[in-house]
Amino acid sequence: MKQDSRFPNLFITDHPLIQHKLTHMRDKDTSTRTFRELLREITLLMGYEITRNLPITTKRVETPLVEVDAPVIAGKKLAIVPVLRAGIGMSDGLLDLVPSARVGHIGVYRADDHRPVEYLVRLPDLEDRIFILCDPMVATGYSAVHAVDVLKRRNVPAANIMFVALVAAPEGVQVFQDAHPDVKLFVASLDSHLNEHAYIVPGLGDAGDRLFGTKN
């Protein structure tokens, strides 16, 4: 895990396996099926990193040999909230890691001015819960900011929110940091820039279209 001095709340997971799989996702000739599988695999691998600091307590269990106080995650419950639609492709990878997590959904689409338009919010109970928001791309940053806004408006503490993405543009990370400097943003790659159409360069194209095999 490394950081960029420009963005104090940004954490980049530079594990070789993650970078290898991300390269294959970037390839324009990668099939929809393979793209989908790689997205799930990368998200699972990133999940190990982003859950590294979950609070731990002990539980008394009986092994076949003895009783022992063994570590378990303390108190707080997990919720996975994909930002629709591309975020759906990441939720399965996180559920592979934490199958007991609750799942919510935040639906937004990008208007002509690139601002997010909300069309759906479905969340589990909020009390004493850690939320992992997921979306493959942080391009302009507006959708990511909006997703965090949804939780903060419902009084979810910033310390209980994490946002995980595959690739991000510096412009979007700056927007996210300006709006939510108290929320950690985890990515696999900080790419070069946004082009005139607000696509991340080099990026991996439209993650939703590549995930579902549709055309914009």
UniProtKB/Swiss-Prot annotation:
Entry's family note: Belongs to the UPRTase family.
HAMAP family reported for this sequence: Upp_B
A GO MF term: magnesium ion binding
Organism from which the protein derives: Burkholderia lata (strain ATCC 17760 / DSM 23089 / LMG 22485 / NCIMB 9086 / R18194 / 383)
Protein name: Uracil phosphoribosyltransferase
Record-linked Pfam families: UPRTase
Cofactor details (free text): Binds 1 Mg(2+) ion per subunit. The magnesium is bound as Mg-PRPP.
Lineage, top ranks: Bacteria, Pseudomonadati, Pseudomonadota, Betaproteobacteria, Burkholderiales
NCBIfam families in the cross-refs: PRK00129.1 (NF001097), upp (TIGR01091)
